[in-house]
């Protein structure tokens, strides 16, 4: 490849106007095996692909690593961390890593064991665009230029469903009017006749329900399938531009890399003859535990029978055994339409749903689908507890936080327990996106919400189980969801140009199948979906059929969930009570007071926590409703006051004593003067020389308004009750 700069453009026509993605190579990162810069507007992403010189022969997997580096200077900002520099990757960066990895990984030659690293660095960010799809295209371009055995290029586009039309590469403003947001990656098939879909990541938007209520079309299965088709022209154009760039740059011929075959045919044939029948019988055992115990026995028997014949090739025996297992599982599905546990291709495992499972927490639920078991737990808090995020994303806070935990015991294994891995972050983000469209607004439900999904047992799609458990838990916590959401994972087996779609896949079907297609939604529309495939691509028509098959399963799951809880429960007695009050913006300063004196006093007197928003909305949180109402009354007395009248009585607090009397606080921000001459009734009718002899600061005293002058100054006298109490003492 020469050192001059080369460029190619992809121009994508959309109903909102043309979008241009520009690719460049030859100027930056020249020492990488392949490097490319992709532009969308002012967004600029540099991707560099490198490869190790020697293979890692001991590995039994493909060592591909994808990293995304968010540089805060891209948005003209300094990192908010203590050291003021970028640290560990943000959640957005990790999710973008996964978006890049998923279509790239199946596109490399099988058996490759050289370490490959793709690093995408965000150098500039246009405030109108998201960088994730730009990074996918940049990564594909740099890998295409690297000379690696790669079946790309891969094109990726975001399409938004806005006003009944699919728009490629929508801006933030357009996404705000969209009912569905979808990232689609794919490649042009060898004969150029079609675009095969390799990866999909999609969700309804937070405003979807309101937009539908306003007349916008809902993102049904048919609409989503049309979106996959709408993405194809953009993907084709992006692939064309990347191929043009490679041609202009004089891309080197694909280099030779050693490919390590897991096993040779003679080992597979020997194993098939030795234990094929026993393995086939073991795979027909429905229960996971019993099946795996028998499979372990057959695996050991297989090793004993062929070990002597293939001495020194033990690794091949293990790989061949896995290949034989995969072959038998897939063959039975295709020929008999029967799966490992005896179900048909459209059958769902036994379902169970239970709410209010854990004491004292604000909301909880246990959802089970076969051997997959998810515990959902909801915690509510004041809005000040929402998460602050320091990323390139324009949203700086997260009110709804979904955490997913996958402990090793969920699969009966030992392992590391600690900070979440990329997979856990990805699963939590998927469940979060599935539920965001049905969450109430801040005004409707002024709480920060943390949802935790504990995968206690795993045998297929814990992420979709998390969606179901979370819906149940949120309703149990009293969160007024706009609609319940359920999810299901679909699988695929491809053989001889036939595609068999599987509903509710097991872990083994995920491992031995060709697709993991997760679909979540309400009864009326899809809220989230995610596609991963091990194939070079899947026809959009197959995915459209899988969407329809998933809908039937989703409705069945929603019926079971509705039996457990059909509407939001009363909030837990242990959850905080949050109410809101609106005040004029010019009264905010009075409520806060000098150096926070007034608001701190209200919090101390009421026991409530108070958060003041810039628009005059005040959120009041307390352990009980009485404390919250006390704080609200105090705030209203300052910001939305009713003028006191002569003759009204108050239980006031002595706040200041002078030589001429005492100042009494009637309500926050409103004091009156109790003159020394009025204190006779508190001292048996005798003249009071020193106010301190009768009153003390902080003392509560029943007083009555005797006069309000033209300037609003209030004069007080002790009420008859106060005089009687003084006489009795």
Swiss-Prot record:
The keyword Cytoplasm applies. It comes from the Bacteria. Keywords: Cytoplasm, Magnesium, Metal-binding, Nucleotidyltransferase, RNA-binding, Transferase. It is an enzyme of class 2 (transferase). One of its GO terms (cellular component) is cytosol. Its EC number is 2.7.7.8. GO terms for molecular function: 3'-5'-RNA exonuclease activity; magnesium ion binding; polyribonucleotide nucleotidyltransferase activity; RNA binding. It is found in: Cytoplasm. InterPro entries: ExoRNase_PH_dom1, ExoRNase_PH_dom2_sf, GPSI/PNP, KH_dom, KH_dom_type_1, KH_dom_type_1_sf, NA-bd_OB-fold, PNPase. Pfam families: KH_1 (PF00013), PNPase (PF03726), RNase_PH (PF01138), S1 (PF00575). Residues 576-635 form the KH domain. This is Polyribonucleotide nucleotidyltransferase. It comes from Frankia alni (strain DSM 45986 / CECT 9034 / ACN14a).
